[in-house]
Amino acid sequence: MLRRFSKKNKNPEGGSDDASRKQKKLLSKFLEFITSSIWSIPIASFIESQSVVFDRQQMETDVYIMIHKEYSQLIDTLIECFCEDVGTTPTELVAAIQLFNQKDVSQQYKVALEPLLAAQNFNVFVPMMMRKNIELQLQALQMIEFMCGLIPSVLQLEDGETLRNMKKLSPEETERYVLISVLRHSKDEYDSMQKGSEELEMMAQNSRIQREALEQEIRKEEILLQQALDEGARAQNQNQNQGTSSTQTDGVNAPLRSVAAMMAATFAIDTATSTDDVTYKFLDQSTGTMTSSTGVSVGTLTNTGVSSGTMTSGVDTGTDADGTVGRPKSAKRVGSAVGKRSVSKGTPSEDAKKSSGSSSPDEAEKSKRERPGTSVKKAIGIVAANSEMSSNGTQMDVPVDEEGTKKRPGTTSKKSIATVTASPEMSSKTTQMEPEQDGEGKKRPETSKGANERKYSNAGLEDIVGPKSSPHEEKKSSHPSSRKGSKATDENAPATRPPSRKAAGGSHEPRAKTPNQKNKDERPTTRRSSVDKNAPKRNDSVPRERKSSVSHDESKPPKPIGPLRGNKYDGDVVLGRAESPGIDHGPRRKNLNDVNSHLVDTNRLNSSDVRVRAQYLREQRDKLLQMKNAERIKQMTDIQQNASLERPKTAARAREILDKDKKEAVAIRKEISDKLKTQILTLHH
């Protein structure tokens, strides 16, 4: 009885314990929710995107109020989604939050609860957004310092390490790079030595001043935030003393704004957090003060000699009415000024006396004059000047004849073929002068053939250069070519040549020569009749003794000309080469021009047929490869199928296969029975 009575008395207390346990569980779920990414990511994205317009120098209250309304709607939406997921009402959530003990709040929950308090209190929202704006400016400044080279030398790559990554350059490119680098170095060496250290010191000083100013602004915003929280806590205490309650009893229909108000009143705690591990020291009030909009006096920097736009980050410093330096302007202008740097040329002591927004035009002009220019154009101008001088030098070296016309200087490579390719005018002049000399009985002038050209027949040279169409050329070629062993000085010199083999044999008299053919060297017919042994020989390079030693036996018929077995000559026409087309070969005095005439044969392969055949072979090869791949794939599939049909090696495997088959059979039977049942039912109905 006593036990029952005690249990009956403890039932109301047990019900209260269950309610408190449920509220604690709901509170723990809410704390987990505000530390999760579902809560933090939307809020962080909203703050980073909207914090750009929050600036102490340009207080736009209307814009701030509109952004605060959007932020409050975002917080209300997130809380509503949490209540729907958990299956509770906003009133129950507020009741659970009232049991929250502020002393048990960790630093992580303090940081997570700050956005919730900012949604209810406008004075907390504005400093939070301004602090985020300054943090973004600090991140941009740090990134720009890293890009500009203001980092320790340990983190930088040396010149030797960067050269290892360069690709191999050709000698011409290497010489060009060396020339450009020498020209630049000779021009910029003195300027870089004088200004390098000063620029680095000035950049480091400007960066330090900007960082200190931004850190000071962060401290100021934290003070304002703490003050707003204190005021909210005092107002809440006064409302509690008067017996007023901000909660509503009708839990389901309670507005979400009242929930946020209750949470803000419950979590009226110190949410000021430091973003860096650096210890800050407040400046003395004697260095200069600036009163903010909320009435808090904060120490600011006064001894800054940085003009607007000196840093590469583009963060400008504004000034107040007293001339003291204020906080940097908003980050909207950070991206537009990146890359623009105009370092002040004065000393730090002189810059301290100047206002932060003013700059002297004389100093700007001086800096513009002292700015080193690039030397690429100079190098290009030097190269162009050298090219002009070289072109002028080549024009002055051109010789001038008696008539005043310029002559092109001759080259040694074209001297050997000069007489063959001479113009008709020059050849006509030569032919006009030669008859007069012959008539006077003087020595005939030597021909202008080169040393190498003298050894070749006219047949080969005509195939190289082309047929002579000018009558003057024919007139000029009527004179026999000069030889090394010939010393004839009159016109009867060609008559002293030994007779041909037929004339020596006495079979018939030599053909009578007309006066026009007396001194004319006829080109032998070298197509089919060149095999005739009775044809006169035109190779002047063979000695006369060798010509006379040729057999005079005519009973042996000439050998027929068969197909060409091989052609030793496989290159271009080069005078002086041992296998050049102009040289006669063999005892029959055949040259390669005669041999090449027989290449037009029915058995010769056509290039188009060769290409068609090659294409056909490629297609056949591709088809064979495709068939081979298909056969290989087929073999692999057969192997896999055979592996599945192999006899199981263990009893467990065999049982597994049998069970699988049984299950499939049962499923099929069940499906058939279901179909039959449906058909029977439809027939009965």
Swiss-Prot record:
Superkingdom to which the source organism belongs: Eukaryota
Family: Belongs to the CFAP36 family.
GO terms for cellular component: axoneme; ciliary base
Biased composition (Low complexity): 287-310
Main location, first listed in the record: other
Location(s), subcellular: Cell projection, Cilium; Cytoplasm, Cytoskeleton, Cilium axoneme
Entries under InterPro entries matching the protein: BART_dom, BART_sf, CFAP36
Lineage: Eukaryota, Metazoa, Ecdysozoa, Nematoda, Chromadorea
Record-linked Pfam families: ARL2_Bind_BART
Annotated coiled-coil segments of the chain: 197-242
Keywords for this protein: Cell projection, Cilium, Coiled coil, Cytoplasm, Cytoskeleton
Tissue-level expression: Expressed in amphid and phasmid ciliated neurons.
Sequence segments annotated as region (Disordered): 1-20, 287-573
Name recorded for this polypeptide: Cilia- and flagella-associated protein 36
Organism: Caenorhabditis elegans
Bias-annotated ranges (Polar residues): 410-434
Residue stretches of biased makeup (Basic and acidic residues): 363-372, 439-456, 508-557
